[in-house]
C-alpha cells in the first residue's frame, strides 16, 4: 500500500526533472527561424589531429551557457549526462568512446550496455571520477548544482541547452566539434535540416488564425505542458500548429483544468514520460470536465508513438516533427501509418 501511494509522487517528481530537458523559442509573436549561429571558436595552434584529419586540437569553444572551454586533446573517454546527448554521440559514431551514461540512456540499443553514473540530475561523482573521463557532456539542468562540483574537480564539461530545433542542430555541431567529428556532424545536421525544411516549406505560410490550437501534455496530475522558449513550442509551430500556452509563460509549467478549458485546444498531443503515455491519454479523455474541449469532442487527442522522439533534443527530433505534423495537418502530410489515439 505504501509503495502504491508513493509511486505517483515519485513519478511526478521524476517528471519535473525530465521536463527541464525540453525548452525553446517563440511567445506572443510568430517565431522566425534563421539558423542559429555556430558557437564562437577561438583557434589555438593545433597539436593533435582529429579522427577526421582536421588540425583542431587544442581548441576553445563556447557552450550553450556561454562558458568558454578549452579542449586540450581529442577526447577518448566521454561521459554523457543526458539521453539526448548520448543519442548525439552515438549518431556521430562515438559509441566506443562513451564510458558512462545515465539511467535513462536507452537509445540506441548499445547505450544500455554502458556504465550508469547518474539519474537525470544527480550523478554519482565518485563513480564518475573512477571512469577517468576527459570530456563530460552535460545539460542545462546540471548548471546550478552539478556543474560547479565538476568544475572544482578540474573536469572538462560542455553544456547543451536546446531551446529550438535550430539549437538542437547547433548542439549536434558543437558536440561534433569538440570530439573531432565536425564532418560527420555537418552531414548529420544537413540531413536533419532537409527533413525540417520538407515540413516547414508546407507550413511556414499558414497564418496564425489558420493554425490549429495545440495543447502538448507530458503529465496529467496535474497537467504539465510547455510554454515559449522550448523546443516543443518551436516544433509545434514548425508543424503548422499554435501552442495554446506560448504567450502565457516560458519553459514548462503545470496548468489547471480551467486554463485548458479556457484555451479550448483543437488538438491535444500527448507524449508521456517513458511508457506512461497511455495512462496520460486515458486520464485526459476520461476527464468529465474536459468533455466539451474541442480536441476531445472532435476525437483529436493523439499519443506520440514514442515519447522520446519529441522529448529528447537529439537527432530523432525530426521523426517527432514528422509525426506531429501529420497529427496537426493530415490534409497536408497524410495520416500516420499507425496512428495512436
Predicted regions and their residues:
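A ligand-binding cleft/hinge motif common to bilobed small-molecule-binding domains
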Residues: 143-152, 267-285
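A short, structured surface patch at a secondary-structure boundary
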Residues: 58, 77-131, 135-142, 244, ...
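Extracytoplasmic substrate-binding proteins
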Residues: 67-68, 145-224, 245-247, 297-341
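Short helix-initiation/N-cap motifs at beta->coil->alpha
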Residues: 62-66, 117-126, 248-257
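Short helices/loops that flank or line small-molecule/ion binding pockets
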Residues: 123-132, 152-153, 255-264
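Bacterial Sec-exported substrate-binding components of ABC uptake systems
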Residues: 5, 14, 21-84, 183-215, ...
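Bacterial N-terminal signal peptides that target proteins for export
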Residues: 1-10
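His/Asp/Glu-enriched short active-site or ligand-binding loop at hydrolase and phosphoryl-transfer sites
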Residues: 102, 228-252, 272, 303
Amino acid at each position: 500500500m505504501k509503495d502504491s501511494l508513493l509511486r505517483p509522487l515519485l513519478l511526478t517528481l521524476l517528471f519535473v526533472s525530465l521536463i527541464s530537458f525540453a525548452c525553446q523559442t517563440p511567445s506572443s509573436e510568430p517565431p522566425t527561424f534563421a539558423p542559429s549561429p555556430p558557437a564562437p571558436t577561438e583557434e589555438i595552434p593545433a597539436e593533435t589531429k582529429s579522427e577526421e584529419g582536421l588540425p583542431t586540437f587544442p581548441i576553445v569553444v563556447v557552450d550553450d551557457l556561454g562558458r568558454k572551454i578549452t579542449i586540450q586533446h581529442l577526447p577518448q573517454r566521454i561521459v554523457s549526462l543526458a539521453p539526448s546527448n548520448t543519442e548525439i554521440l552515438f549518431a556521430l559514431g562515438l559509441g566506443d568512446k562513451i564510458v558512462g551514461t545515465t539511467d535513462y540512456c536507452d537509445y540506441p540499443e548499445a547505450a544500455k550496455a554502458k556504465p550508469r553514473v547518474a539519474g537525470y540530475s544527480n550523478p554519482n561523482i565518485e563513480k564518475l571520477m573512477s571512469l577517468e573521463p576527459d570530456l563530460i557532456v552535460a545539460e542545462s539542468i546540471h548548471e546550478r548544482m552539478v556543474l560547479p562540483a565538476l568544475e572544482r574537480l578540474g573536469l572538462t564539461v560542455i553544456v547543451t541547452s536546446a531551446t529550438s530545433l535550430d539549437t538542437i542542430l547547433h548542439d549536434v555541431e558543437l558536440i561534433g566539434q569538440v570530439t573531432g567529428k565536425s564532418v560527420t556532424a555537418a552531414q548529420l545536421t544537413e540531413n536533419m535540416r532537409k527533413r525540417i525544411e520538407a515540413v516547414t516549406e508546407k507550413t511556414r505560410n499558414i497564418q496564425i488564425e489558420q493554425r490549429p490550437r495545440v495543447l502538448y501534455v507530458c503529465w496529467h496530475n496535474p497537467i504539465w505542458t510547455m510554454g515559449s522558449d522550448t523546443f516543443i513550442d518551436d516544433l509545434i509551430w514548425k508543424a503548422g500548429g499554435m501552442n495554446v500556452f506560448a504567450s502565457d509563460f516560458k519553459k514548462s509549467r503545470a496548468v489547471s483544468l480551467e486554463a485548458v478549458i479556457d484555451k479550448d485546444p483543437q488538438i491535444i498531443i500527448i507524449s508521456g514520460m517513458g511508457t506512461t503515455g497511455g495512462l496520460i491519454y486515458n486520464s485526459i479523455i476520461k476527464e468529465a470536465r474536459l468533455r466539451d474541449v474541442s480536441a476531445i469532442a472532435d476525437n483529436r487527442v493523439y499519443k506520440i508513438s514514442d515519447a522520446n522522439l519529441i522529448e529528447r533534443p537529439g537527432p530523432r527530433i525530426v521523426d517527432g516533427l514528422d509525426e506531429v505534423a501529420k497529427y496537426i495537418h493530415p490534409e497536408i502530410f497524410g495520416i500516420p501509418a499507425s496512428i495512436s489515439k
